[in-house]
Swiss-Prot record:
Cofactor: pyridoxal 5'-phosphate
Name of the featured protein: 4-aminobutyrate aminotransferase
Subunit structure, interactors included: Homodimer.
Coiled coil (residue ranges): none
Reaction(s) the record says it catalyses: 4-aminobutanoate + 2-oxoglutarate = succinate semialdehyde + L-glutamate
Record PROSITE patterns: AA_TRANSFER_CLASS_3 (PS00600)
Alphabetized CDD domains for the sequence: OAT_like
Family annotation (NCBIfam families): GABAtrns_euk
Enzyme Commission number(s) from the entry: 2.6.1.19
Length: 495
């Protein structure tokens, strides 16, 4: 069906989708989002004429080429995003996995009208120098309410990239502090660092994994290896990259083979730590390689990584920028691993609204101003996090994620069974799921088509579609998606 004919059918309510039985939709302890739309509404092409006009206007000022459409955030509700042309889409992409409790959440709106929020918005402080009087209490009531086990310190930052960048700095400073036995800096170190020379500027490295993504600042980009276009023309550090396990699915049918794959990857990590020509001070790993294609490893692999880092005195950074804040059914994805000792550093951003990293006192620099910037985060985002955490607890959103994720996964298997070889490698935890298509072109075709049916989605890796719904996404929303996904497959693959 052509896109113009599709829009015509949609607008005349003649477009019939396969109905996944509503009687089989599971219930969750989470209440419905107040004032939410009942279902997607598509009136125009996407992007529509008003979005196209704004894209053309923006093009005169900055690069708009990545824009899907222009959003009308005032008109968006809960799990549904509105565009400027009046289309209402079920949002399963959620600002690249960064919206936790819905558009225009009433509790956030209520909080934003308070004097605390107004003061934080109009009097933005340099938190490291002149923190507001309620900053310690705000940290206790937000960040420390969800701190990973074993980590009692938090460094606040502005985004996921700078959270990881500052985590690398913390690792390097810790490594050198241990190396010099806690002694003061030498005059030679102090003078040589001003020339970018050793010993003050030591030659150290961070080990990362192929297909990983950790940001686009200079240090993080040297550890990002998901897409060439991110790295082209940018100088990079000569840091090692290990192979991340490429598991075979279904996992239960390939347990022996996958264990061998993970063992080989662990051996490679240890060999790189022992032999890389630049000493490895730390490693960074995502619980799920999100941007790189939703690549998974089992708890066995991560337990092995922790053992290796402890054995060799190498810091372990877990990048929970995309996986944190409950999307896998646990607040932190690394909770699924059952580690014998916690990671040294856990970084966060996206759904947390705020950004930064958790650590313990060993990773606090020996002097002030060493890991520092003007803002050191934003109190408004901490205030937002405080509300979000309250909503997660009050509305049982982690339980909701597990129930909703299971329903989504079952529905994907149901549809995949009717299209052998097309929908591949259904995988994930909670609602943090992904599927593969045979080629990038097939994946992109599906995303474009289902958008015309009122579902906003995103890809990752070479040929994957990633599911990144909000924590307030319920089985009823997934039922709407499954109907439209099934119809998309029919339209594209069954004449």
């Amino acid at each position: 069906m052509s896109s113009s004919r599709l829009i015509k059918c949609l607008s005349s309510n003649n477009y019939i989708v396969r109905s996944f039985s509503k009687s089989s939709i599971p219930t969750t302890p989470t209440p419905d989002f107040p004032g939410e739309y009942k279902e997607p509404i598509v009136k125009t092409q996407i992007p529509g004429p008003q979005s196209k006009a704004l894209i053309e206007r923006l093009n005169k000022l900055q690069d708009p080429r990545a824009a899907h459409f222009f959003a009308d955030y005032a008109n968006s509700r809960g799990n549904y995003i509105s565009d400027v042309d009046g289309n209402i889409l079920l949002d399963l992409y959620c600002q690249i996995a960064s919206i936790p409790i819905g558009y225009n959440n009433p509790e956030l709106i209520k909080a934003a009208k308070s004097d605390r929020w107004v003061s934080a918005i109009i009097n933005r402080p340099s938190l490291g120098v002149l923190p507001p009087k309620d900053w310690p209490a705000l940290i206790e009531n937000s960040f420390m309410q969800v701190s990973p086990k074993g980590l009692n310190q938090v460094f606040t930052a502005m985004c996921g990239s700078c959270a990881n960048e500052c985590a690398y700095k913390a690792v390097f400073m810790h490594y050198q502090h241990v190396k010099r036995g806690g002694k003061p800096f030498t005059p030679e170190e102090l003078s040589s660092c001003m020339k970018n020379q050793e010993p003050g500027s030591p030659s150290l490295s961070i080990l990362s994994f192929k297909k990983g993504f950790h940001g686009r600042t200079f240090g993080t980009l040297s550890t990002t290896r998901s897409k060439a276009i991110h790295k082209l023309d940018i100088p990079a550090f000569d840091w090692p990259a290990a192979t991340f396990p490429d598991l075979k699915y279904p996992l239960a049918e390939h347990a022996k083979e996958n264990r061998e794959i993970e063992d080989r990857c662990l051996q490679e990590v240890e060999q790189l730590i022992k032999t890389w020509h630049i000493p490895v001070a730390g490693i960074i790993v995502e619980p799920i390689q999100a941007e790189g294609g939703d690549n998974y490893a089992t708890p066995y692999f991560f337990q092995g990584l922790r053992d290796i880092t402890k054995k060799h005195g190498v810091s372990m950074i877990v990048d929970e920028v995309q996986t944190g804040m409950g999307a896998t059914g646990k607040f932190w994805a690394h909770e699924h691993w059952n580690l014998t000792s916690p990671p040294d550093i856990v970084t966060f951003s996206k759904k947390m609204q705020a950004a930064g990293f958790y650590h313990n006192l060993d990773y606090r620099p020996s002097e002030s101003y060493r890991n520092f910037n003007t803002w050191m985060g934003d109190p408004v985002r901490a205030l937002e996090l405080e509300v979000v955490i309250g909503e997660i607890k009050k509305n049982h959103l982690l339980d909701n994620v597990v129930i909703t994720g299971n329903y989504l996964k079952d529905g994907l298997f149901d549809i995949a069974a009717r299209y052998p070889g097309l929908i591949q490698n259904i995988r994930g935890e909670g609602t943090f799921l992904a599927i593969d298509f045979p080629t990038p072109a097939e994946r992109d075709r599906v995303i474009s088509h289902i958008r015309l049916l009122g579902v906003e989605m995103g890809g990752c890796g070479e040929r994957s579609i990633r599911f990144r719904p909000m924590l307030v996404c319920q089985p009823s929303h997934i039922n709407q998606f499954l109907n439209r996904f099934d119809q998309t497959m029919k339209e594209l693959y069954k004449n």
